[in-house]
């Protein structure tokens, strides 16, 4: 049986651009794409921490080292420049593979520089 698990995420990315008339997508600094284990044209989910919006789009590459996070097309209506977002990708896998799976988690500062990386999320304490 296949299950769907978190593959990789960019946590607390800061939107640097919103381009309504650009082809729909999310342009992400190519270095960050690689670090989070994402791929060009891969479907991603966006969770806007500032306004609660949740939507799907796909990855396009922005210039490496630019720290760009640009929401394009219709997705530009769901964010404001400066909003903090979570960008997540998921993958389907067999349960045996899921037992060994480690997601690529990238935690960002407000300027989209890398704060830290991990492959685990601590247990939430009550």
UniProtKB/Swiss-Prot annotation:
State its Enzyme Commission number(s): 4.1.1.11
Mind listing the UniProt keywords for this protein, alphabetically? Answer: Autocatalytic cleavage, Cytoplasm, Decarboxylase, Lyase, Pantothenate biosynthesis, Pyruvate, Schiff base, Zymogen
* MF term (GO), any: aspartate 1-decarboxylase activity
Keyword Membrane found: no
Residue positions of the active site? 25 (schiff-base intermediate with substrate), 58 (proton donor)
Pathway given in the UniProt record: Cofactor biosynthesis; (R)-pantothenate biosynthesis; beta-alanine from L-aspartate: step 1/1
Q: Where in the cell is it found?
A: Cytoplasm
Q: Could you say which protein family the record assigns here? A: Belongs to the PanD family.
Name the UniProt record assigns to this protein: Aspartate 1-decarboxylase
- The species this protein belongs to is Teredinibacter turnerae (strain ATCC 39867 / T7901)
The lineage is: Bacteria, Pseudomonadati, Pseudomonadota, Gammaproteobacteria, Cellvibrionales
